[in-house]
Amino acid sequence: MTVADLWFDPSCPYTWVTARWLMEVRKVRPVEVRWHVMSLSVLNEGRDDDPEGDPEGYLWIPARICAAVQRDHGQQALERFYTALWTTGTGDWIGDLRTALSAAGLPVELAEAGLGTGYDDVVRASHAEGIALIGGDHVGTPIVAVTREDGERVVFFGPVVSRAPTGEQAARLWDGTLLVAGTPGFHELKGRPHEEPHTT
């Protein structure tokens, strides 16, 4: 079976749309999705500007909770929590963290992990693993590393999509992305300017 490792910042709406696309892909292609946290807060450390507009460091909180969920409860729990973050709120951004933990069948006390630095090393290590695969910090979230059954690995940033395709459209985007990203020498492809993400 093909494995798609997804590195995601849980607060990024475009990444959530990409995650929904991968959930669709696994319905129509033999793909296992594995979840890994990364952090835009880590990515943007030391920059003069703050492209995320997060001077208070709020974006650390959901990333830390994801790291705690992954370390203490595993992959399936992380997928459930990440999904609940985006499906228990208003739909345009992540919902209440405790509500999402409860909806995912996880202890709501895990929300406390977001308020301290105890999981920062876990976040940083997972983030560094994804960034190392893509070869530097010239990209953001998400990073996808696809390992095919023959062992060949294709790594790419994105795709950044505003709407999650379903069914055969999801499969076509998957097949095309692997074809393009797996071409020796391929670096970048961009489409039209971004639309607001359709997160529901």
Where are the model-predicted features located?
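Structural alpha/beta surface segment adjacent to cysteine/selenocysteine redox centers
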Residues: P10, W16-L97, G176-V180, E188
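C-terminal cap of thioredoxin/glutaredoxin-like
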Residues: W21-M23, W93-T200
